[in-house]
């Protein structure tokens, strides 16, 4: 069998990697071997941080709810317990948005939570 030279395929594969490395600094952008390593590492970072982002947002929502709840003389854990006992089913994302944008409505939720805890 004759030898098959893979010039076209090799060039296409390398071009794809270099294209993915667009925006990187120095040799990570231009040299194939270094660019390939950095693209692999970037993929690992992206995979990890897609999961990390979910945790970070949940932490942010909880922090915002806690700060708003403490303005109404209540801790975060007591507020969430009170809302659960009052059968108010609202997720943390929406609760944090209410705490930021609508102080009056959040105050009413806190009052209902306090009543449910009594």
From Swiss-Prot:
Belongs to the bacterial ribosomal protein bL20 family. Binds directly to 23S ribosomal RNA and is necessary for the in vitro assembly process of the 50S ribosomal subunit. It is not involved in the protein synthesizing functions of that subunit. HAMAP family: Ribosomal_bL20 (MF_00382). InterPro entries: Ribosomal_bL20, RIBOSOMAL_L20_CS, Ribosomal_protein_bL20_C. CDD domains: Ribosomal_L20 (cd07026). NCBIfam families: rplT_bact. GO terms for cellular component: ribonucleoprotein complex; ribosome. The lineage of its organism: Bacteria, Bacillati, Bacillota, Bacilli, Bacillales. The keyword rRNA-binding applies. Pfam families: Ribosomal_L20. The keyword Ribosomal protein applies. Keywords: Ribonucleoprotein, Ribosomal protein, RNA-binding, rRNA-binding. Signal peptide: none annotated. GO terms for biological process: ribosomal large subunit assembly; translation. This is Large ribosomal subunit protein bL20. GO terms for molecular function: rRNA binding; structural constituent of ribosome.
């Amino acid at each position: 069998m004759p030898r098959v030279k893979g010039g076209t395929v090799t060039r296409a594969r390398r071009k794809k990697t270099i294209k993915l490395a667009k925006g990187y600094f120095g040799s990570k952008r231009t040299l194939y071997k270094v660019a390939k390593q950095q693209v692999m590492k970037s993929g690992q970072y992206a995979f990890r941080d897609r999961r990390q982002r979910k945790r970070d947002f949940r932490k942010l929502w909880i922090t915002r709810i806690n700060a708003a709840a403490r303005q109404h003389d209540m801790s975060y854990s007591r507020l969430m317990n009170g809302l659960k006992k009052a059968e108010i089913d609202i997720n943390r994302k929406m609760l944090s948005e209410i705490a930021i944008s609508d102080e009056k409505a959040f105050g009413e939720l806190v009052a209902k939570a306090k009543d449910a805890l009594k």
